[in-house]
Every structure is written in C-alpha cells, then in structure tokens.
C-alpha cells in the first residue's frame, strides 16, 4: 500500500515535467519581420512586427502576429499568438486536401485544389509556407487580389478551415 502512495506522490510531484514532455513539437516559420514606427510628441518610436506560421506538419497550423521593441521578443510573442490560433485540418492518405476550397481575407482570395501524389506544393509566398507547415504535401494554390503576406496567410487559413471530410458531410446530411 505504501509503495502505491509513493508512486502516486512521484506522479503528482513530476506532473509539470510530464506535461512539458508530452507537448507536441511545432515547426515555426517566419514569414516577415518589419520595422514599424509610432510617431509621438517626443519623436518616432521604433518597434518590430513579426509574422510567424507554426504547425506540427500533421494537420495543425496557426498564424501569429506580434510587435515588440526587439526582434527576438516580437518573434516569441508571435509564436504564442500562433498557438492560440491553431486550427486542425483533415488530410487525405496522399497528404493532400480532401476537396477544392476558396479562402478570403480582405482583398486576398486563395484558391486551393487537391493534387495527385508526387506533385508537391505548387503555391507561392505565404500560402506555400502555411501549407508546408500544416503538413500538406500535394496541393495547387493560386493567390488573387493582393500580395500582402499577412492577409494571404490568413486567407489560406480561412480556406483550410472550410475543409470537411466525407463522414462530417454524412453526419450533417443525416441529422
């Protein structure tokens, strides 16, 4: 009986350590760091804005944006913001998307279509980074409207959010 209590206490004592070990590893990719300034009465105050995409390369992806006085802190804050905005998307066996989708954000419009195995990620700019970090290996994407990196990344995320599987469609139709 006492040995069981000791094991239980060990588990409780090391619970924080165990939680950190089980946390999934995320891949972080920096889209852009820009220098921004705020004009005040005393002059211009410079800071940095970081746009980061992070995902587990297995169907989870998020975009984070943050500002800070230096680049390192902006990057860290953007990573935490990206973790708050994670979405999960369904992937097919060929690591493609299940169907065509269109994502919009602001003036940006992203058209994504599934591709056959071996074709790779055919996309440009921020959309390519979002798809690679999400774990999509075979897809064709086209950017329309704007070249803004942040808006294109968010449009890609909104398009990926709309993806559904066959079972989800069946459930929706049956109920």
For each of these PLM feature ranges, what is it?
Residues 1-175:
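Ribosome-associated RNA-binding proteins
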